Amino acid sequence: LIISGMKKATYFSYLLFLPFFLLTIDQNQAFANSVIEEKPAKIIYALAAPFTTITDNISLRDFSDFWSGTSAVQSETIHGKLLIVTSDPERFKTLFGEGDKNQIEFVTDIHAALSQSINNGNWLIVPFDQLDARFKVISIDEQNPLHKDFNDNLWPLTIRINGNENMTEQDWAAVQPLNRDPSKLTTMILTGVTALVRGTAAYMDVWGPEYPASNIGDTLREADILHINNEVPFAKVCQQTESELARLVFCSKTSALEMLKSIGTDVVELDGDHFQDYGDDAVYYTLKLYKDANIPYYGGGANIKEAQKPLIVEDHGNKFAFIGCNGKEIGYAVASDTRPGAAHCDIPLIVSQIKELKASGILPIVTFQHIELYKIYPNEDMAADFKAVADAGAVIVSGSQSHIPMAFDISKDSFIHYGLGNLFFDQAFFLPETSEATLDRHIFYNGKHISTEILTIKFTNNALNRFMTESERTAVLNRIFAESHIELDQDEQ
């Protein structure tokens, strides 16, 4: 960068933001142009905490009081010193005041800050695009830069540079942030078990096919990419007998497809145990229904080649590849060269697919129909498969099979969730844990997985669920997080 002839004030402004400039290589040209030409610019910072933090929101008043040292918020929410990653503390002091040195600390080394946060639980203020999946973003007064309705002009951690005293709020509103471009932001919701059968189907027969999603449908529809793991085939004639149900042989009525369409399903996983329950004809019929509805599928297909083929999806400039397989002993609805069904897990093949996709700039998303365990942390076989594909480069590794919410293992480059629980299935009263589940809303920005929001749901009957109350959510997250792990990166050790 040539700086000769640069005005002194502009030069020092550039130096103050140099660490940010170096960290965000993909946006450095836009930033440099704004600084050198003294154009008004905005940089979005996020309030973040380790992923296993329970708190979701803090009021601006409590945040400001903590900053100034006039509040005991720390003992309830903010843990330890608040670490602000910046080389220009004065801009934050202009917003919030000098600050209590016992409460806040300005740091320039982002790796050291991330390490301290993971090891000690400190909260952070970091540039939005420097987030990674080991950290959750804390809302301030219910505003959150991960959300589609985010308004940077109402966000207290929006840093304005190169403005002048004549600029109005309307002028600033027209300035687009340098490090948060909505055209590069993708939200993806991954879900657990869907099986529109038995008790769930009975409610749908009475109240209509869209009934199970009555309380959560709007949230599902809002996702740019909604994943559904539908374990059961559709049948032209689906009239289940008591004998079939006793043997756990399932089918869904064709009308049930309307529910999947109504919630905006974008991709369907077909590696479930029950995919061949009604024979080859039902599988072919199911595949045709999805094709006619323009809902792409993966993990199952008309033959083994189709079942094993990664599904490529692109949204807001981010490219993804969905790969799915059944990790139980061979025989569960398995496809072959001549028969339709689910892909049995071939881990060496998946590892090679992941590496090839990653080299092409595509983000691999691997979902498993694996062993169904009614405990929080997986057994050795399950953990080995999940970690093998994570080590190969899978960005997300998600367990679609579990009937209860399970633990997480998260590194800088890979997010593992061993099981989410039921999305639509009639186990509300089987065990207390089977009435609980998560929806994992993953956020990607400019080709990078930057954060995940865990939405928690609870069943009220065998078909209908709702979002949890705060106390219900806290209890579930505490239980899951107690057996979850966050790893340091090599640069942070």
Regions found by a protein language model. Give the residues of each.
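Generic N-terminal amphipathic/basic segments
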Residues: 2-3, 32-44
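Residues marking helix boundaries in flexible regions
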Residues: 3-4, 26, 37, 355
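Bacterial N-terminal signal peptides that target proteins for export
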Residues: 4-14
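Bacterial N-terminal signal peptides
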Residues: 14-23
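Sec-dependent signal peptide cleavage junction
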Residues: 23-35
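Exported/periplasmic ABC-transporter solute-binding proteins
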Residues: 38-179
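Acidic, metal/ion-coordinating pockets
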Residues: 173-493
